[in-house]
Amino acid sequence: MPKIMLRSWSNTLVSVRQVTQRNAGHRTPGVDGQVALTSTARAEMAVQVHRTISTWDPIPVRRVYVPKANGKRRPLGIPAQMDRCHQARVRHALEPEWEARFEPKSYGFRPGRGCADAIASLFTTLKGRSKRVWIVDADLSAAFDRVDHGRLLAALGSFPARDMIACWLKAGVIENGSFTPTEEGTPQGGVISPLMMNVALHGLEEAAGVRYQTSGSGAGDTRPDSPVVIRYADDLVACAHSREQAEQTKARPAEWLAPRGLVFNDDKTKIVHLTEGFDFLGVNVRRSRNGKLLITPSPAAVKRLRKRLADEMRALRGSNAAAVIAALTPIIRGWAAYYRGVVSSKTFGELDDYAWKLTWRWAKRSHSGKPKGWVTDRYFGRFNKFRNDHWVFGNRAGRDERGNVPYLIKFAWTPIVRHQMVTGTASPDDPDLADYWAARRRRVKPPLDSYNLRLLTKQAGRCPLCRDPLLTADQPPQSPQEWERWWLSVVRRAIAVDYLVHQDGRGKPDGNQTRLIHASCRRELQARTRRMPARPPATSPRLA
């Protein structure tokens, strides 16, 4: 099967489409500066990718740095777009095989799994009277930069594209015009790098002493006396029954990781009791005095958000209300969407109070000579007709033809929805589980408004023109920042509302209908028909 996938023209087309249109970084070039942004360029790239299946020579990656939450910078390696297309093609051939092997409690960078599943797994493991009260909160030190190439390639066995993967690993890095060879690690930023990290870490659970029941009604569940390891990429948590078991659960993986070039980060790895609490994937997990397990947004995450909101408002001094709404709306939507699956109601309310204070200060500063009543009448009111809230920040000057005032949404308007955790080792690649994944997609609803959510459900989540998923093809966003980018790139720019006029049997208009399609598909449709697009309806895709 891998050989068939590697030679498949359909795989090439899907890979090129994913890299050049669907991925968030499709406009980001590598060292060659080349990106395919038009239909003609994408078609030429697909032909070139398919012609060079066995002859492609990988290009060094371009080094860039992105800021981390702790103030440091994370190095990323951006491959050329041709390399990314080849990597996507190889990943599609390799991933199904490894998805059938991976541990059930590994959630990072896997199709159909994500942060919400890892957090839900923690809740299931620790809730109630669970005796696993000692926690190993572990973090691998620079895992992507240190993984041993030899061990990784040995794990791939006889995979047909193994040599090409080796070339990607050894391609090197170009930074400020100078070339540096890569003797270890897999660069963050590559399409295939997350899969390589999961392959390298496969077996960590067994090394930690995790054992599963193999028979009876509990087959597939963790043994009652066994620790539980929940991993998201290079970030993991081990839940043990005693301090001694926790020490062993930390020591055994450390020995297993050493030959693979990986070590625990001593500054971030610690053993704590569940009542002390710990942070994992942006949430704080602890058991309260009454024995109830609480999972809330971590204080560090809340502090970072408050600082960012304050910085944004400071930068907006002298701007108008429309700029304030445009700048803050994606931040609020993204943060609320990520934390809507945990105990966030109190935090959302506190953040709404903080955001209101920031907007009030901005309004007072913008009109320092005006009384409070004038400022209130100009910028605050009941602009959301579905909410009985008269202190919503809005832009009265931007009132549309229907009298609607653009306004700033609030955190608390995002409903708390418990996440439905993925079951065991279920994989989207398993044809026997097609009904399970279809039902799961219906239950796990994206944070859209009710109108567009109905359209999305009616279309089974797919674009009627290309039949690809409309929102997230591989997995949902995995952080508040990714949710923010998802809102900006997917909902605002990548999805369009198509306006249809149906006719009855006599050729007369028979009502108006709308459908959601990819913006790129709409542009291609307009290019083919050479017609001007009809006026879109008033309702557009937006988050709830």
For each feature predicted by the language model, list its residue ranges.
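Non-catalytic, polymerase-adjacent accessory regions of viral genome-replication enzymes
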Residues: 1-45
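Reverse-transcriptase-like RNA-dependent polymerase core
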Residues: 18, 48-72, 81, 85-96, ...
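Conserved polymerase palm-domain catalytic core
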Residues: 101-113, 117-277, 474
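A conserved non-catalytic segment of reverse transcriptases
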Residues: 170, 260-335
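Extended C-terminal regions of large enzymes
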Residues: 354-454, 543
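Short, charged surface segments at domain edges that flank catalytic/cofactor-binding sites
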Residues: 428-484, 508
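Short Cys/His-centered divalent metal-binding micro-motifs
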Residues: 468-471, 508-537
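Histidine-centered nuclease catalytic patch
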Residues: 470-516
